[in-house]
Design a protein with these regions (language model features):
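Long, charge-rich alpha-helical interaction segments
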Residues: 226, 230-234
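PRPP/pyrophosphate-binding module of the type I phosphoribosyltransferase fold
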Residues: 195, 202-206
C-alpha cells in the first residue's frame, strides 16, 4: 500500500524551535505544530525518578553524546541565555541536537495521527537572508547526514533550505494544503519583515521575482532581551531567559515570592526596538512600500512591534500566528516537492 509522503518544516529559531508537519493527502493533522525553547545543555544524571522520566522527552543523542533540550535544558541548566547566539551556529553540536529533537517531535506528531510508518519525507529548513547563499549547501549536507543516521533504511529523505524571509510569503502564495491561492504572483509586489530573536530579515518580491538587492538582515529581538537583562541586573532581579520572556508577556516578575510590576523596564526596551525596526523598514524598502500589495510582518518579534508597523503602513499584515509563519511556510513549500 502506498504510504502518504510527508512534509516537515522546521524553523530553528534562536529563541524557540518551531515544527510544522503536513501530509500530501491534504488532510490536516491533529496537533500538527509544536514549539520548544532553543536551549541545549549536556546531559547529566537526574536523581529524582519522576523528573528523570519527564526529561526523557527532552533527551537526544548526537554522535554518541547525550543532550537535554528545550524546557528540561532550561530548568536543569538554569539557562541565562538561549543557545546558538552566533552566525555560525549551524556548525555546532547544539544546532545538531535541536534539529534531531525537532525531527523526533515531528515523528511523534505523525505517530499520533497513525502515520508513524511514513517513509517519504521532505524536510525544509531555513537561514537568514544575509548568509543564505553562504550557508545553504553546508546546512543541507549537514542536516541530511544527521537525519539519515536516525531514519530507517527504507525511508527516503530530501532536505531543502529556504530563506527565512521568503517563508511567510509562501503562506500567502499557497494554502495550508500546498495549493496555489493566486496571490503573490506575477502581478503583485510583496515585502516581508521577519523578526526573529537573532536577526530581522527583509525581502522584496516584485511581480514574481525576488529582488536580490532587497534581501538583507538587521538585528533581532535579542536587543529587547539585552536591554531588559541589563535593567533587571541593575535592580537585583534575575535576568535568565525564562524570567525575561515572561516579563515581556506579562510585564511582571516574581521575586522572593512576590509579584512585581516591571512594565517601566520592559516598555522602554520594546519601544526602542520598535523604533529601530521601523527605521530599518523605511531604509530598506523606502518608497517601494507604497506599491506593495502587502507587507508581511512575521516572526516572534511581530507580537512586540507589529501594531506599530501597521499604524505606519496600511498594507502591513500580521499573520494570525506570526511566530509559526516561517515553519508553516517551510512545510507548505515541502508539499510542492513531494
Amino acid at each position: 500500500m502506498q504510504k502518504t509522503p510527508i512534509s516537515i518544516g522546521i524553523d530553528l529559531g534562536h529563541s524557540s524551535v518551531k515544527v510544522s508537519v503536513k501530509s500530501a493527502n491534504k488532510i490536516a493533522l491533529n496537533g500538527a505544530t509544536t514549539i520548544f525553547p532553543t536551549v541545549v545543555r549536556n546531559w547529566t544524571k537526574i536523581s529524582n525518578e519522576e523528573t528523570a522520566r519527564k526529561a526523557l522527552a527532552d533527551t537526544v543523542e548526537v554522535n554518541g553524546k547525550k543532550f537535554f533540550v528545550g524546557v528540561t535544558a532550561q530548568l536543569q541548566g538554569q539557562a541565562e541565555n538561549f543557545s546558538g547566539q552566533s552566525r555560525n551556529w549551524i556548525e555546532t553540536e547544539q544546532h545538531d541536537a535541536l534539529l534531531v529533537a525537532a525531527w523526533i517531535r515531528a515523528q511523534r506528531i505523525l505517530a499520533q495521527n497513525d502515520m508513524g510508518d511514513a517513509n517519504t519525507f521532505s524536510l525544509v529548513l531555513g537561514l537568514p537572508a544575509s548568509y543564505y547563499d553562504e550557508q545553504r549547501e553546508p546546512l543541507r549536507k549537514r542536516a541530511l547526514a544527521l537525519i539519515t543516521k536516525i531514519i530507517q533504511p527504507d525511508q527516503k529523505l530530501r532536505v531543502f533550505i529556504e530563506s527565512q524571509s521568503r517563508a511567510p510569503l509562501l503562506c500567502v502564495a499557497f494554502d495550508a494544503y500546498g495549493s496555489e491561492t493566486g496571490r503573490a504572483g506575477d502581478s503583485e509586489s510583496w515585502g516581508v519583515v521577519e523578526i526573529g530573536h537573532y536577526t530581522t530579515d527583509f525581502t522584496f518580491h516584485d511581480r514574481g521575482q525576488e529582488v536580490d538587492g532587497a534581501a538583507s538582515s538587521a538585528s533581532g529581538a535579542h536587543l529587547v532581551y539585552d536591554r531588559i537583562a541589563a535593567s533587571f541586573k541593575a535592580a537585583g532581579y534575575l535576568s535568565d531567559t525564562d524570567t525575561i520572556t515572561n516579563a515581556i508577556k506579562t510585564r511582571k516578575i516574581k521575586s522572593f515570592g512576590q509579584e512585581i510590576d516591571v512594565g517601566h523596564m520592559v516598555e522602554p526596551a520594546i519601544q526602542e526596538f520598535s523604533s529601530y525596526i521601523q527605521e530599518e523598514v523605511a531604509t530598506r524598502f523606502g518608497e517601494k512600500a507604497q506599491r506593495m500589495d502587502g507587507l508581511i510582518v512575521a516572526g516572534g518579534g511581530a507580537y512586540m512591534v507589529g501594531s506599530d508597523i501597521k499604524a505606519n503602513y496600511p498594507n502591513a499584515i500580521v499573520p494570525t500566528n506570526p511566530r509559526f509563519a516561517v515553519a508553516e511556510g517551510y512545510s507548505r513549500f515541502g508539499l510542492l516537492t513531494l
